[in-house]
Amino acid sequence: MTRVRRGYTARRRRIKIRLFASTFRGAHSRLTRTTTQQKMRALVSSHRDRGRQKRDFRRLWITRINAVTRDNGVFHSYSKFIHNLYKRQLLLNRKILAQIAIENKNCLYMISNKISQIKEII
């Protein structure tokens, strides 16, 4: 069997890993073994946090909507506000509601007043 000289292939693989880990600090960007370990760890963290990011943003939107609805006084809680939105078939998602709550509170107050007026009629 002939001998395989792996110089170019191995170097190219290490350079690719080094470029990925170039922003890491200390030995994590210089030593081959630690860079490969850190690359694996970084990829695992990014995969995990993509799922976590969705949960965190949903929690943030709910907190913002809840703060404004409690300020308003029409609905005493977020859950009642969302329940009445669904009952009236006003399908606004939480992201849009949170954006309205921050940028234009009066618009959210108008929505909540409209829901409460419909409730009184029924």
UniProtKB/Swiss-Prot annotation:
This is Large ribosomal subunit protein bL20c. GO terms for molecular function: rRNA binding; structural constituent of ribosome. Its main location: plastid. The keyword Calcium does not apply. GO terms for biological process: ribosomal large subunit assembly; translation. Binds directly to 23S ribosomal RNA and is necessary for the in vitro assembly process of the 50S ribosomal subunit. It is not involved in the protein synthesizing functions of that subunit. It comes from Dioscorea elephantipes (Elephant's foot yam). Coiled coil: none annotated. GO terms for cellular component: chloroplast; ribonucleoprotein complex; ribosome. InterPro entries: Ribosomal_bL20, RIBOSOMAL_L20_CS, Ribosomal_protein_bL20_C. It is found in: Plastid, Chloroplast. The gene is rpl20. Belongs to the bacterial ribosomal protein bL20 family. Keywords: Chloroplast, Plastid, Ribonucleoprotein, Ribosomal protein, RNA-binding, rRNA-binding.
